[in-house]
Amino acid sequence: MARKSLIQRERKRKKLEQKYHWIRRSSKTEINKVPSLSDKWEIHGKLQSPPRNSAPIRLHRRCFSTGRPRANYRDFGLSGHILREMVHACLLPGATRSSW
């Protein structure tokens, strides 16, 4: 189980990313439209003004049940060992077992 502070930090980053999403997206499209280099630098400065934790690259996918940040399966939102346990216990409909 991941520490609660790490899970809270991820939640905070997700909120910040959603808050500043349109600012980042609009400034990125604006950079591509502007022909002059000096204007691009000004827009790039605006792009750097939001907090670092609002960047989508800083988000991690975490396991829904344990909070583990590694070996997550996107389709299920679970880490590998929890997924295996749930499949063996027939808790995930449609998932077939394999000998791994």
UniProtKB/Swiss-Prot annotation:
Source organism, top-level taxon: Eukaryota
Any single Pfam family the record assigns to this protein: Ribosomal_S14
Source organism phylogeny: Eukaryota, Viridiplantae, Streptophyta, Embryophyta, Tracheophyta
Gene Ontology MF annotations: rRNA binding; structural constituent of ribosome
Record's keyword terms, sorted: Chloroplast, Plastid, Ribonucleoprotein, Ribosomal protein, RNA-binding, rRNA-binding
Transmembrane segments: none
SUPFAM superfamilies: Glucocorticoid receptor-like (DNA-binding domain)
Organism: Chloranthus spicatus
Keyword Cell membrane: no
Any Gene Ontology biological process: translation
InterPro entries the record matches: Ribosomal_uS14, Ribosomal_uS14_bac/plastid, Ribosomal_uS14_CS
Biological function: Binds 16S rRNA, required for the assembly of 30S particles.
Subcellular location(s) of the protein: Plastid, Chloroplast
Family (UniProt): Belongs to the universal ribosomal protein uS14 family.
Subunit structure: Part of the 30S ribosomal subunit.
Primary location class: plastid
Gene Ontology cellular component annotations, sorted alphabetically: chloroplast; small ribosomal subunit
Cross-referenced PANTHER family: 30S RIBOSOMAL PROTEIN S14, SMALL RIBOSOMAL SUBUNIT PROTEIN US14M
Name of the protein in its database record: Small ribosomal subunit protein uS14c
